[in-house]
């Protein structure tokens, strides 16, 4: 009987907390999304933007979601449009400090993924890095998992983004 509390503690530590459930997305097709023309600020100072996101994350106890892509990329623009939908935007703002980084045609701001040990060419975009406020990557090996965003449902994309919440 004295082992029950220890067993419960061990189960909690090994299983961890569950991620937050993604909001229900009010559309079923990505064709219903208003797709922005240029969601990535081409001349932005990505290093400063990412540093500021981490400063806010440390203050607010949130994770950082770094959305890397380019304005030429249809999947990147579709994902950006989905993330602006009110139901998903509110969810993301509650759980993450969101920052967008223009990687051009895989030739700009590559020092950002390098901060997290990604020193080879990105597999595709959009590429999403989720990190703790201390800078520890949470989704290693899954950074380019939604590079084919246009072939996913809006709900599947929201669920993918939600799985990395604390």
Predicted segments with their positions:
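The canonical Cys-X-X-Cys-His
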Residues: 73-77, 128
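N-terminal leader/targeting and pre-domain segments
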Residues: 21-60
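Bacterial N-terminal signal peptides
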Residues: 5-16
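Typically the conserved alpha-helix immediately C-terminal to a functionally engaged Cys/Sec
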Residues: 76-91
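Short pre-active-site segment immediately N-terminal to redox-active cysteine/selenocysteine motifs
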Residues: 61-64, 69-72
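Structural alpha/beta surface segment adjacent to cysteine/selenocysteine redox centers
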Residues: 104-125
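Non-catalytic, surface beta->alpha helical segment in thiol-disulfide oxidoreductase systems
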Residues: 122-166
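Thiol-based oxidoreductase modules, predominantly thioredoxin-like and allied folds used
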Residues: 88-110
């Amino acid at each position: 009987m004295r082992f029950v509390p220890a067993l419960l503690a061990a189960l909690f530590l090994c299983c961890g907390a569950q991620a937050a459930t993604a909001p229900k997305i009010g559309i079923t097709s990505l064709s219903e999304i208003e797709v922005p023309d240029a969601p990535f600020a081409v001349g932005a100072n990505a290093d400063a933007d990412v540093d500021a996101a981490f400063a806010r994350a440390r203050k607010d106890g949130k994770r950082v979601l770094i959305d890397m892509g380019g304005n030429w990329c249809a999947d990147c623009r579709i994902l950006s449009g989905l993330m602006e939908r009110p139901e998903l935007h509110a969810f993301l703002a509650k759980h993450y400090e969101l920052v967008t980084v223009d990687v051009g045609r895989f030739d700009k701001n590559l020092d950002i993924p390098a901060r997290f040990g990604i020193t080879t060419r990105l597999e595709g975009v959009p590429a999403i890095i989720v990190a703790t406020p201390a800078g520890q990557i949470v989704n290693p090996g899954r950074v380019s998992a939604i590079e084919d965003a246009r072939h996913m449902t809006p709900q599947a994309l929201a669920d993918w983004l939600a799985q990395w919440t604390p």
